[in-house]
Amino acid sequence: MSDSVILRSVKKFGEENHGFESDGSYNNEKKSRLQDKKKSDSVRIGFFQLFRFSSWTDIWLMCMGSLCACIHGIAQPGVLLIFGTMTDVFIDYDTELQELKIPGKACVNNTIVWINSSLNQNVTNGTRCGLLDIESEMIRFAGYYAGIGIAVLTTGYIQICFWGIAAAHQIQKMRKSYFRKIMRMGIGWVDCNSVGKLNTPFSVDFNKINDSSADQLAIFIQGMTSPIFGFLVGFSQWWKLTLVIISVSPLIGLGAAIIGLSVSKFTDYELKAYAKAGSVADEVISSMRTVAAFGGEKKEVERYEKNLVFAQRWGIRKGIVMGFFTGYMWCLIFFCYALAFWYGSKLVLEEGEYSPGALVQIFLSVIIGALNLGNASPCLEAFAAGRAAASSIFETIDRKPIIDCMSEDGYKLERIKGEIEFHNVTFHYPSRPEVKILNNLSMVIKPGEMTALVGPSGAGKSTALQLIHRFYGPTEGMVTVESHDIRSSHIQWLRNQIGIVEQEPVLFFHTIAEKIRYGREDATMEDLIQAAKEANAYNFIMDLPQQFDTLVGEGGGQMSGGQKQRVAIARALIRNPKILLLDMATSALDNESEAMVQEALSKTQHGHTIVSVAHRPATIRTADVIIGCEHGAAVERGTEEELLERKGVYFALVTLQSQRNQGDQEENEKDATEDDIPEKTFSRGNYQDSLRASLRQRSKSQLSYLAHEPPMAVEDHKSTHEEDRKDKDLPAQEDIEPASVRRIMKLNAPEWPYMLLGSMGAAVNGAVTPLYAFLFSQILGTFSLPDKEEQRSQINGICLLFVTLGCVSFFTQFLQGYTFAKSGELLTKRLRKFGFRAMLGQDIGWFDDLRNSPGALTTRLATDASQVQGATGSQIGMMVNSFTNVTVAMIIAFLFSWKLTLGIVCFFPFLALSGALQTKMLTGFASRDKQALEKAGQITSEALSNIRTVAGIGKERKFIETFEAELEKPYKMAIKKANVYGLCFGFSQCITFIANSASYRYGGYLISNEGLHFSYVFRVISAVVLSATALGRASSYTPSYAKAKISAARFFQLLDRQPPINVYSSAGEKWDNFQGKIDFVDCKFTYPSRPDIQVLNGLSVSMSPRQTLAFVGSSGCGKSTSIQLLERFYDPDHGKVMIDGHDSRKVNIQFLRSNIGIVSQEPVLFACSIKDNIKYGDNTQEIPMERIIAAAKKAQVHDFVMSLPEKYETNVGSQGSQLSRGEKQRIAIARAIVRDPKILLLDEATSALDTESEKTVQVALDKAREGRTCIVIAHRLSTIQNSDIIAVMSQGMVIEKGTHEELMVQKGAYYKLVTTGSPIS
């Protein structure tokens, strides 16, 4: 009798069941989602929250760095105390000289008196004289400057170095925490977030956070200390003037606040747009073969560019705000100059409260402080960008997982038998809450039995397995193991009891031994060998160059589908799990391998609970219990005989399969009656007997008649990845030479109008500083004039000039900010687009290189384009600004004292040496840092792209450990970089004070001995030293410049590479009457990444137009490789592939592929709507909806699509994750049908379908083949026997060919494969 579904009592464990309601439903997931939504709406990152990952050591480093930054900041207003005193000395000295020049005055007894005048004979003037030795005074002041310079060198080094080290440590911890949280968030959450979106922070956002919490912050603290100290000094001694000067500070603060808020908001929007673009890039590069096959390169570039446009808009808006308010603040500062000198001169000249030196000291203390506030705006931009970037990262880190795979909570049973029950389970995928997948599913899976779940695609079979594995939690109801709700279990313990093999196996980038050892880390070599033998993988592994130590590429991409599946099965078997889940586990195998693996699985059944999802009745018959599923519910249960009597879901499945195979069996019996093949029945015992008999027979005759299965085309495994890298033709990343500045500049050529305007603004802004020095020295000179009215007149005129400079600065600063933001964003967008386009234009062999994994390429794409701006865009504005500054300063300086100017210029080489050293060392750091982060990016991409496999085998911690180990390299480099940058920064700051020291000493000599006016000394020194300061400020961008040269070099390397197969080329032959005649002529081929392994060895086969050719052979014999040659993913090393008599190498690549449609065994769908996925079949035109529907109907997917709430607008999720495999395959078939190709390639196109769908789709494919040339790769006889030509392959060559009847008459390899009962391989 068939068993009815029995509901057992459930043992609930205390606090672990807090989510159960009175009705038994479990609503914790829903509540969590609501909490997450509320949280995400209110997340705002405060500035100090950026340092939440700091340790006590980091805090100490930041405190010491801040203390040194404060001391450094005090140095500037502190030196003004010396400067003010020195000014009074200069003015007193010049005043004395001016008075002594008056006829009738002389210095008598250190007092100026009138002489030789009858009226004023010997009348004293009261002015002291003869007491000042100006040269000695300047020696004293020079000593003060030198002492402060040495202090600045020390504090400058410490502030940059300590903050850099602390930031590096915190960023490292932040990266680790973010990756840990992603890995423990659960499958449901990852479904709702694309892999590209989750990966983007690793390459972009963390860099922005680092910029906001490392050297920029130290410089900001230094800059903020100057105004604070200056204001304190001013208020303590000269409050009147200080109060007037500081009155404009609130307006400056308002501008700074607006900049901070606006930039933060715009940066957040910009980052989100880039994250979407990164998601597109990751998806496309991960699916490169599908994109190439359907000619989607241009379409994908356009899709990528659309997201870049949004980012560009926000970036330009950010530049407008920055330019406007930077100009606004400079305008206020110059207005403040005018006000301060006008009012200050009144206090000096009319009221006599202050000396000129005091006026200068107050003024410069406050104004330099205000200037530092203005210069802090780039830091504010970095802080705002860092906060915006941290917002989404911290939101993820703080999010509470619905299913925490690393939680230590939950029960662990000492013994487990494997009893599983579903209690009224209803389930919706988190990303598609409106679609009910399971609908009150109730079923019991008894321990030690093999239970098969059968039913049409989309019935919820695979979903049920995912609930057992606790990838998701049920929306309602519960799943129990040993009568315990699995939501109360320890997740890792539960998953360790489960082994899983899926239809589309995922193998990570390791040796085969390590791939299998992922199942159990403590497995010995003997365990690995035993598991490989049980999975029928041992023989092909031993044929590999390095056997179990062979490296087979990312995802196992260098193995055939069947070989990958067998390794995945070995990985599951080595766990020796109590519960084994088989989700279409053998669908990718040829019949030969499937039979052997099925027997191996049947041997492991003892003591294990096996739950199998399969479509083939031959696979299902070995089950003890069969459960029929339909519409998300279990509708029948029983043994095979019972379900056949019931005539329900299973009966319909078997009937369809039987009808399909009946013709096959009759044909075989007719052709081979002498072999007396017993007719197969539905009896489980008979099936197993015949299976074992066929296996025994195969051991005698199998493909030993054929040549021995060739070694699988894989590359030799090297002891390390570095050794493997040496074997590549491309240079290692560390060998890339920095790009030339000239070529980098050419990148911005299309934006020359913007850059011209911006450069004009920058030139004016650069001239402002030396003009300020000129006006400032002019004002000082007026205080030594004897005529008070003349003093007042000149000061008023100079104040008006300051107002004029303010107005000009407002306009030019805005012009510079806007135009360079515009040109920079256009450059970034174009570079990203060109880089992405160049990547998609590479040949498929290029993507086989381990350095060009999807993770590495998306990381490179995201960072390189933005970092190139470090040598172009706004950096050009900085260079023009600095160049103009120096040029105008030199002109002024040489006009007034060429000797003093030359003395100061002697210090310029020291500044240049500092910048050159910094550039050279940081360039090396940038290259190595990029390489190390790309390796980490490969790990994150591999883990997140295959999160189901990672979770299924419980290796989250292993990936986390590997990722964290890779982070050690960039961390150590960041420590070295902090020391180098700190030393260079301290030196560049110190040299200004040393230059001042020497200049004033020499200036005193020139005043004393050559009569140089003191105002000229001020004018020359101020102009030259301020211009040198501008150069020093420009050198602070050296790290960005160093990174830019490396990033640009990498871009040029990509853009300059000429792929052997250029998809964008318009060259090549085209013809109107494309027939579809195909000839493989003595084709020999080795994959570019493994040239030592021969995959095709003289493949020769021809087919006429509208014929069907079927390739038959063992896994790894080159069947799929031949299809890739036809698609021109690769070209043969020897021989030709002829299309209508044209050598494929000479045919236009776009024209060729536009006439070919392909349906692969593992369908790749994109994260867009079903409609867009089907439209992807023909990217040359806009496909009307009628054609899409017609193609869907032919592929038997239309009814399913119409049952969805959003119908054809339904998003299929990342890689089609929201659909069953059968649904994905049918959409892929519809995509091929809508292409209407002349040549149709079917690579196991129906292997993933249930019998009912397979029959209908096979009919559709048969119709689609009419009038077309078709190449079929299949393992099932029914799929290939009606082919016009059947080619049996082995060792990369065709060993026999003909029709089914001809090959049966020949009684060769094909005949024996059919007649012995041994499946076709």
From Swiss-Prot:
Query: Which N-terminal stretch is annotated as signal sequence?
Result: none
Q: What residue spans carry the region label Interaction with HAX1? A: 651-672
- Please give one Gene Ontology molecular function term for this protein: ABC-type xenobiotic transporter activity
Q: Which GO terms describe its biological process?
A: bile acid and bile salt transport; bile acid metabolic process; canalicular bile acid transport; cholesterol homeostasis; fatty acid metabolic process; lipid homeostasis; oligopeptide export from mitochondrion; phospholipid homeostasis
Domain (ABC transporter): residue spans on this chain: 420-656, 1078-1316
List the ranges whose topology is Extracellular: 84-147, 237-240, 341-353, 777-794, 1001-1011
Q: Which residues carry this modification: Phosphoserine?
A: S587, S690, S701, S704, S1214, S1321
Carbohydrate-modified residues are: N109, N116, N122, N125
**Which domain of life does the UniProt lineage start with?**
Eukaryota
PROSITE patterns attached here? Answer: ABC_TM1F, ABC_TRANSPORTER_1, ABC_TRANSPORTER_2
Record membrane topology: Multi-pass membrane protein
Q: Kindly state the tissue distribution recorded for this protein.
A: Expressed predominantly, if not exclusively in the liver, where it was further localized to the canalicular microvilli and to subcanalicular vesicles of the hepatocytes by in situ.
Question: Where are the residues of the annotated region Disordered?
Answer: 659-735
The biased composition feature labelled Basic and acidic residues covers: 714-731
Where is this protein found?
A: Apical cell membrane; Recycling endosome membrane; Endosome; Cell membrane
Q: Name one GO cellular component term.
A: endosome
Q: What does this protein do?
A: Catalyzes the transport of the major hydrophobic bile salts, such as taurine and glycine-conjugated cholic acid across the canalicular membrane of hepatocytes in an ATP-dependent manner, therefore participates in hepatic bile acid homeostasis and consequently to lipid homeostasis through regulation of biliary lipid secretion in a bile salts dependent manner. Transports taurine-conjugated bile salts more rapidly than glycine-conjugated bile salts.
- Domain comment, in the record's words? Multifunctional polypeptide with two homologous halves, each containing a hydrophobic membrane-anchoring domain and an ATP binding cassette (ABC) domain.
Q: What is this protein called?
A: Bile salt export pump
Q: Please tell me the species this chain comes from.
A: Oryctolagus cuniculus (Rabbit)
